[in-house]
Amino acid sequence: SQCADSIFAFINAQDADIICLQEFYLKDLQKLKSYLASKMKGYRAEYYMFPSRNGAFGNVTLSRLPVTGKGKIKFEESANLAIYTDHKVGDCRFRVYNCHFESYNISFTGMVRALFNADTDVFAETGTKMKRSILRRPRQVDQVFSDIESCPVEAFVCGDFNDNPMSYTYYRMTRGRKDAFVESGEGFGATYSLLWPMLRIDYVMV
């Protein structure tokens, strides 16, 4: 589609050696490798996708650097996960974690519609979704952090954390690492503007 083409054009323009994508969706899982190869020439793709009736979605890591190993960290009762790739450049070895922590799964348009219609059932369901996400995410974070702690090489963490810089998620994932945006960015660095124009929930920890 034109939208997908414009996104891939932007990604290619960044000229990054490693790219981490979350919530990547494709209708035909069988065509994923050829699709990525056509859009991201020169990159090797590592991924884990959850198949569904309407397609497949998951995490994708694209790399121009040699990949010496890979793995996944699946979360209990969740369609979210983390994948990692091991790399070797000269004598330097390191691992990149590509994380997607529990989402709230809340429809903004659905909330607005419920507000106008005074639909209390939707608000009750929203509360249940928020509670589930708030309970699951710290467990997922601890699971990834435990894997990082046992990692024999330097680890970098990227991903959609679905949490703000004042959260337990952020505190845990910055242990022993620096927030790349704080080190080199400026302004608020919003990555999700639908609910709040200054919300940052996506990170690169180095």
Residue ranges and their predicted role:
Residues 1-2, 153:
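Mobile, glycine- and charge-enriched loop segments
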Residues 35-39, 113-115, 173-176:
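Glycine-rich, phosphate-binding/catalytic loops in enzymes
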Residues 2, 9, 16-21, 27, ...:
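Catalytic domains that recognize anionic headgroups
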